[in-house]
């Protein structure tokens, strides 16, 4: 039996290492007491499947590698977090935050011998830069005696934050005996994400969300170990972002109370940073630009309202594009890109410029656009759109940013008769057929998956099981998988506002979070996921996040959250 266990430990250490030396830490942990009966041994495997029991490893999203035992360690009333990175305000805030989230009750001392007094958070790097591919790996070690304390080891503060979230889910309170405890010790967890880009898109144009709601939304993303808030800030319906360069642009907001000031924007970005969340701003262009024209009418096509094909009801659609023949369109569009990509604003390297659903019919009735096309030797409206998009892409590249665009741009540049190639720097975000990723990766483009089925959460017929069963890498050649950066689930806000946002997004986004974090070979594994998902929902309810029940918009009957 000992030989079998030693082999298991060696396999665990050697296989799929996340780059942190752990041999010294393992030697400090008493492993001889770990149970290796069939069920728990199966749970220790790195190849999780639907046949596994999730009674022991009740963590969401599932960690990459786990070893655990059957001993309960009790937590001292004087427990504390300590760290080697004492100068990091980000880590200090995270430690304080999780301490308050975990220890909400008064606890008593326990007479048992297994007492945990401290967890050391050891971080290798002081670099707190948030960019695509930042290191989120972490390791957790909890002794079965408590004598040696516990450890969270990470390359960056953001890995430590992910580890603290896992620890939160491991600690429980015994209300009868009045003490905190960690069951199934000792624990060894080695974890790192499957994809570097794991996000949720939220549309704040169709309905406005306050800064406090957006901050709470960002917190919910971090609890799920997402790392991107894709902020679809503006659209045809409203332009709520304050611009110091073009102050009249917010005339396109719903009202003077529904505007994000420069201070608001910076506050949201800073809050996200403290939770390890990148904020990727999207300003869609040249389509969906009606709101731009409220303050600057010259950027919209002349006589568009008289064009039968362009008569779209507002505010439900209003998909009026920019006038790509207007100098003002370029001045404002390029100026906004420069302003919102400044060092004092969005430091994020990805910037989304949309490029989707350009309504060419709105250009039909504009003599100015037709004359401009003749002068520029532009033969089609598709070429006119490409002319504009190239300018926007080049502007972002010059600013040192990575352009992100919806799949329409990839399809436009690849359409018949178009000789211009989509610049290789562009990241393509797919929102129709996910198999389009076979083509985008074949052509060398970095790709994000956001197929409307099942990643569009405004579709009420999509349940969490359908989201969970979707495999973003299906069909992509193994050699091109590196080009699949991950994906985003999307919440369009036509029928959603602050009153129902969290119930609409969660728990379905939970499923996306795990599939983008943890590699599951057997995609039909909802049975394996459901008990953990139900428990994780309870954790979010405890933290004030109004996640809906798994299969309904409201509870079916009186019941316990944890036992339902």
Curated annotation (Swiss-Prot):
MF terms (GO), sorted A to Z: beta-N-acetylhexosaminidase activity
Localization, UniProt: Lysosome
Gene Ontology CC, one term: lysosome
Chief location: other
Keywords: Glycoprotein, Glycosidase, Hydrolase, Lysosome, Signal
Domain of life: Eukaryota
Entry-listed glycosylation sites: 43, 84, 303, 347, 364, 377, 439, 524, 551
Signal peptide: 1-19
E.C. number: 3.2.1.52
One annotated GO biological process: carbohydrate metabolic process
Record field: catalytic activity: Hydrolysis of terminal non-reducing N-acetyl-D-hexosamine residues in N-acetyl-beta-D-hexosaminides
Active-site residues annotated for this sequence: 357 (proton donor)
Family indicated by similarity: Belongs to the glycosyl hydrolase 20 family.
Main function: Responsible for the degradation of GM2 gangliosides, and a variety of other molecules containing terminal N-acetyl hexosamines.
Name assigned to this protein: Beta-hexosaminidase subunit B2
Organism annotation: Dictyostelium discoideum (Social amoeba)
Gene: hexb2
């Amino acid at each position: 039996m000992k030989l079998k266990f030693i082999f298991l430990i060696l396999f665990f250490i050697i296989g799929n290492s996340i780059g942190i030396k752990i041999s010294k830490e393992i030697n400090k942990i008493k492993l001889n007491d770990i149970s290796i009966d069939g069920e728990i041994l199966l749970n220790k495997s790195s190849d999780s499947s639907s046949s596994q029991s999730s009674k022991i490893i009740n963590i969401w999203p599932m960690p990459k590698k786990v070893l655990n035992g059957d001993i309960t360690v009790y937590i001292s009333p004087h427990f504390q977090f300590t760290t080697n990175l004492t100068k990091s305000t980000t880590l200090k805030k995270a430690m304080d935050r999780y301490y308050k989230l975990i220890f909400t009750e008064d606890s008593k001392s326990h007479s048992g011998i297994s007492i945990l007094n401290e967890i050391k958070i050891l971080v290798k790097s002081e670099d707190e830069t948030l960019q695509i591919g930042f290191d989120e790996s972490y390791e957790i070690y909890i002794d079965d005696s408590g004598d040696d304390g516990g450890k969270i080891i990470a390359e960056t503060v953001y890995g430590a934050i992910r580890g603290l979230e896992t620890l939160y889910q491991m600690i429980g309170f015994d209300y009868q005996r009045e003490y905190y405890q960690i069951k199934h010790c000792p624990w060894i967890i080695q974890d790192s994400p499957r994809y570097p880009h794991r996000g949720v898109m939220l549309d704040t144009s169709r309905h406005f969300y306050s800064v406090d709601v957006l901050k709470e939304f960002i917190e919910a993303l971090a609890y799920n170990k997402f790392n991107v808030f894709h902020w679809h800030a503006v659209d045809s319906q409203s332009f709520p972002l304050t611009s110091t360069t073009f102050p009249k642009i917010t005339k396109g907001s719903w009202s003077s109370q529904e505007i994000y000031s420069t201070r608001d924007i910076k506050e949201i970005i800073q809050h996200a940073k403290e939770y390890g969340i990148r904020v990727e701003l999207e300003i869609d262009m040249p389509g969906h630009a009606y709101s731009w024209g409220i303050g600057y009418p010259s950027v919209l096509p002349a006589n568009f309202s008289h064009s039968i094909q362009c008569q779209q009801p507002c505010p439900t659609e209003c998909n009026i594009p920019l006038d790509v023949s207007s100098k003002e369109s370029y001045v404002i569009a390029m100026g906004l890109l420069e302003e919102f990509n400044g060092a004092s604003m969005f430091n994020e390297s990805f910037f989304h410029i949309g490029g989707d659903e350009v309504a060419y019919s709105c250009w039909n009735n504009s003599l100015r656009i037709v004359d401009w096309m003749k002068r520029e030797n532009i033969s089609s409206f598709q070429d006119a759109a490409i002319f504009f998009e190239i300018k926007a892409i080049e502007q972002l590249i010059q600013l040192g940013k990575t352009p992100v665009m919806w799949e329409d741009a990839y399809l436009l540049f690849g359409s018949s008769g178009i000789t211009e190639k989509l610049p290789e720097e562009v990241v393509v975000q797919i929102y129709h057929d996910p198999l389009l990723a076979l083509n985008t990766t074949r052509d060398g483009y970095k790709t994000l998956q956001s197929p409307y089925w099942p990643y569009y959460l405004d579709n009420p017929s999509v349940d969490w099981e359908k989201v969970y069963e979707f495999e973003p890498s299906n069909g992509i050649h193994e050699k091109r998988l590196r080009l699949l950066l991950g994906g985003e689930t999307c919440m369009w806000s036509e029928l959603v506002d602050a009153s129902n946002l969290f119930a609409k997004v969660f728990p379905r986004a939970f499923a996306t979070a795990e599939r983008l974090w943890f590699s599951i070979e057997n995609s039909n594994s909802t049975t394996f996921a459901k008990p953990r998902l139900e428990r994780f929902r309870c954790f979010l309810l405890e933290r004030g996040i109004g996640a809906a029940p798994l299969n309904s918009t409201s509870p079916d009957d009186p019941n316990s959250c944890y036992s339902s």
